[in-house]
């Protein structure tokens, strides 16, 4: 049986200030925990049902000192999602390490993306399209929010995020790199040519788009052509469309299924 202190500690990590205080966060569900166990994240503990440990006996035996057996009832009482029926991990957060676009590399920039589900989805999309770095404004939602982690489906283990003041960051680091921003009124994405030298792609806030302070650094405004009557696209969907068009301009890079 889990101790009261253990239950209190895990539950506290659902709140941002306690994640920051303890420098820890929670990861729920078999897929995400399995990816976590194969990553470079430092894991404090894994609370798992007996069934999970038996099903994945090889990997659980490799990390047996981390595992603590719990019942399904205990697990569902701790987690944020009732669909979690296998495991939950407590993990140390990483340092907020500086990131920038290297030669021929594209980096995503998120300007005040506020919805955790959207951020998690964008991380997953970035992973799919081979984007390894995301630079976030200080007001972008916390990457360690349980909803972000869940929506990323394990991709948080492969995509690095850096939080910073975007205006200062771009002023110092953009240099002669292309900085493309997603806007409602810009050059058609279908006609835009992403340079092989790489650069930055900015996605804005769900309601307000790219802020004025960040817009100053945009060298190319691009838009996804609209054919129907919808007012706008979800920022996650828009990110996928833009990255897909970017990769379409490259030949022989994608991994076939």
Each language-model region and where it sits:
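Short, aromatic/basic amphipathic alpha-helical patches
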Residues: 54-64, 214
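Boundary-proximal intrinsically disordered activation/regulatory segments immediately upstream
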Residues: 1-54, 140-141
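RNA substrate-binding interface of SAM-dependent RNA methyltransferases
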Residues: 38, 95, 100-186
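Structured adenosyl-cofactor binding patch, chiefly the S-adenosyl-L-methionine
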Residues: 86-89, 128-129, 143-157, 212-256
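Active-site/ligand-binding-proximal alpha/beta "capping" segment
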Residues: 181-228
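Short beta->alpha connector loops at strand-helix junctions that form conserved
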Residues: 70-71, 111, 137-138, 160, ...
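Glycine/small-residue-rich loop that forms an oxyanion/phosphate-binding "nest" at active or ligand-binding sites
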Residues: 67-92
């Amino acid at each position: 049986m889990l101790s009261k202190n253990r239950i209190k500690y895990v539950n506290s990590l659902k709140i941002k200030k306690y994640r920051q205080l303890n420098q820890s966060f929670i990861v729920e569900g078999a897929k995400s925990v399995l990816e976590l166990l194969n990553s470079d994240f430092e894991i404090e503990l894994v609370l798992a049902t007996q069934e999970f440990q038996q099903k994945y006996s090889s990997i659980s035996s490799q990390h047996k000192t981390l595992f603590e057996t719990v019942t399904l009832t205990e697990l569902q009482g701790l987690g944020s999602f009732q669909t979690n029926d296998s495991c939950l991990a407590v993990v140390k957060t990483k340092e907020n390490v500086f990131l920038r676009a290297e030669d021929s590399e594209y980096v995503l920039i998120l300007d005040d993306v506020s919805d955790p589900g959207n951020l998690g989805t964008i991380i997953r999309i970035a992973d799919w399209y081979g984007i390894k770095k995301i630079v976030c404004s200080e007001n972008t939602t916390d990457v360690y929010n349980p909803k972000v982690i869940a929506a990323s489906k394990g991709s948080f283990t492969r995509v690095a995020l850096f939080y910073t003041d975007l205006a200062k960051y771009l002023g110092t680091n953009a240099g002669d790199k292309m900085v493309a921003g997603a806007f409602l009124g810009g050059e058609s994405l279908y006609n835009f040519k992403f340079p092989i030298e790489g650069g930055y792609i900015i996605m804005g806030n769900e309601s307000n788009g790219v802020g004025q302070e960040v817009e100053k650094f945009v060298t190319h405004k691009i838009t996804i052509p609209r054919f129907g009557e919808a007012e706008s696209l979800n920022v996650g969907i828009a990110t996928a469309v833009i990255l897909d068009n970017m990769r379409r301009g490259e030949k022989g890079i994608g991994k076939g299924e």
